[in-house]
Amino acid sequence: SKVNEASKTAETSQETEPPKETEAPEAVNLVLGETASFENFEITVTNFDFTAKAENPQKGKGGALIPSNGETVANIYFDVKYNGKRAISFPFFSCEVVYGDGYTFYSERIWFYDNGVDAWLNTGTIEPLTPKFGSVFSFFVPEEVRDNQENTLSVIFYTSSSTAPIAVYNVR
């Protein structure tokens, strides 16, 4: 019958067509204090600053990383809400700092606040229904990044499962 021939033709053409590539979602521009949602996360950038060392946000607990001469530490502070239904291991996403004409720096230290143990950690698991928690990513960067206010400075967020940026916070 013509109906069967048409369905066979449709099945054959579906099998021979190459799979369509899906475009990565466009990165969300974050503004200080506003929340961006992606995958199973909501993040809110709460602060950005430069410090002399990367240390546990609970001052006096844990060690500190001291940058080399001529470097400083750039810190991005943000709150995270995980909306997933399964536990995931840290790191669940990453960040990089991009300065000027594409100079890129990767995090030296990542901290997140574990509500269950009331402590800042740099490894662990996030369980479903975990309340919102704080995070800090710290980067060693040349002092020029801090001092040269004329060049752009951005923090780009990625999920651990993708190389496409999911969010961008423009510091300047």
What are these regions (language model features)?
Residues 1-172:
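Conserved functional micro-motifs across diverse proteins
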